């Protein structure tokens, strides 16, 4: 869900 977190 986060912009820069492993595609989450």
Swiss-Prot record:
Q: What family does this belong to?
A: Belongs to the allatostatin family.
| Entry function | May act as a neurotransmitter or neuromodulator.
**From its record, what is one biological process in GO terms?**
neuropeptide signaling pathway
User: What name is this protein filed under?
Assistant: Carcinustatin-12
Question: Where would you find this protein in the cell?
Answer: Secreted
Ordered alphabetically, the record's keywords are: Amidation, Neuropeptide, Secreted
The portions of this protein that span the membrane are none
According to its UniProt entry, this protein's organism is Carcinus maenas
| Main localization of the protein described in the UniProt heading | secreted
Statement: the UniProt record of this protein carries the keyword Cell membrane: no
Q: What Gene Ontology terms describe where this protein resides (cellular component)?
A: extracellular region
Chain positions found as Leucine amide: 8
